[in-house]
């Protein structure tokens, strides 16, 4: 371990490292990096984040028994691959933390039976799952996530209001950003296409924070408070984040993900146009129907 210019004495590691060691997360990621390739070779999509592993199987026509049976078989085989992989690497699969959720259109109702992980362990389909802090439901309407977000934000705002008179304004603003607005900005790209009734519920949280920071009263204008703080409304804030991210991807910025940058291709016109730019994007496909899959 090297900190600044100081280097610790070398220690031989034959099996693993003590829990809490700085090498623990790195070595764990090295071991788990093999798992996504094993699942993708089997035709199952997968991605990992630290100790959180997610895999999925997609199929068409929810009412088709053959497609559904094939998907269930592939999921069961994927669980077998994961169990075998963990057994070989001295790890243990925790059935209590293992969940699966079927996603479908609002018009298609999928009634999945419990999946068997082993001869004595099975898991039932969940209506809601937490994906790295984001609560996802089977219809992707995010009602549960909005309710959970409001509950947590107002809980912290109530506690911060109790100590506001003891903290300078600058430090109080830092606490509000750390405990509340950071939650509003987390995964706020999903707010872009939410209906107005859900956006208004999230907007009340931002309005309360703005009034608290500017010293406004309950019935004062929240718009004026946001203007004083240079805050965009929730929907505009989500749009701005998406536009900034898209600009980085299109212009091949250093911190733009390569898997997204490679999906965009530019073209050059054969004649001079009013908009003469080297970064003109090629046209993308258009959707005839406004379905969930098309909007994504």
What are these regions (language model features)?
Residues 1-296:
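Hydrophobic/basic alpha-helical segments
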């Amino acid at each position: 371990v090297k900190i600044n210019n100081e280097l610790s004495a070398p220690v031989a590691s034959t099996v693993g490292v003590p829990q809490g060691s700085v090498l623990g997360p790195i070595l764990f990621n090295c071991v788990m990096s093999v798992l996504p390739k094993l699942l993708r070779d089997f035709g199952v999509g997968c991605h990992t984040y630290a100790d959180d592993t997610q895999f999925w199987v997609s199929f068409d026509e929810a009412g088709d028994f053959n497609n559904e049976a094939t998907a269930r078989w592939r999921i069961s085989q994927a669980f077998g691959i994961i169990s075998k992989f963990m057994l070989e690497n001295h790890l243990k699969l925790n059935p209590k933390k293992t969940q699966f959720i079927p996603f479908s259109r609002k018009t298609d109702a999928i009634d999945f039976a419990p999946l068997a992980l082993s001869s004595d362990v099975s898991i039932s389909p969940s209506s809601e799952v937490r994906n790295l802090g984001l609560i996802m439901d089977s219809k992707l309407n995010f009602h549960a996530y909005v309710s959970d977000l409001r509950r947590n934000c107002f809980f912290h705002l109530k506690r911060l209001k109790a100590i506001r008179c003891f903290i300078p304004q600058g430090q109080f603003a830092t606490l509000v950003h750390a405990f509340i607005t950071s939650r509003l900005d987390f995964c706020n790209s999903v707010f872009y296409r939410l209906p107005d009734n859900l956006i208004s519920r999230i907007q009340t949280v931002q309005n309360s924070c703005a009034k608290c920071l500017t010293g406004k009263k309950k019935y004062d204008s929240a718009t004026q408070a946001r203007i004083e703080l240079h805050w965009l409304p929730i929907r505009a804030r989500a749009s701005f984040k998406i536009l900034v991210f898209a600009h980085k991807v299109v212009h091949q910025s250093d911190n733009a993900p390569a898997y997204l940058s490679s999906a965009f291709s530019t073209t050059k016109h054969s004649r001079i146009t009013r908009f003469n730019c080297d970064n003109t994007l090629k046209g993308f496909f258009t959707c005839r129907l406004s379905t969930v899959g098309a909007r994504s």
